[in-house]
């Protein structure tokens, strides 16, 4: 988990956290669905439940979000496989995230996420 603004951003882009996902976690609007998805991945790495809930569309947002408070999950990396603009205010992002729980083997998770833009802000809708 990054501890200073100059640490590399967990999302995989070649920038430090302060110039990459940090501004979105502080309230700036993501310019597109892929950027929002990367910021959400970084929020999982940083265990930032407040950002995850705020960036989740109200129609599908859970009442609460329980993250790995014991710190057993180690996020290992993110690969965006494709981004699809499905309409003027909708998009989908397919990505692969890698993580490890405790001392176990690394796990690869592929997700096909849907996003919607409302009032100039992108929101995570759901995944399939």
From Swiss-Prot:
Pfam family, one: YchJ_M-like
Domain of life: Bacteria
UniProt xrefs under InterPro entries: NTF2-like_dom_sf (IPR032710), SEC_C_motif (IPR004027), UPF0225 (IPR023006), YchJ-like_M (IPR048469)
HAMAP family in the record: UPF0225
UniProt similarity note: Belongs to the UPF0225 family.
Protein name: UPF0225 protein XAC4297
Species in which this protein is naturally found: Xanthomonas axonopodis pv. citri (strain 306)
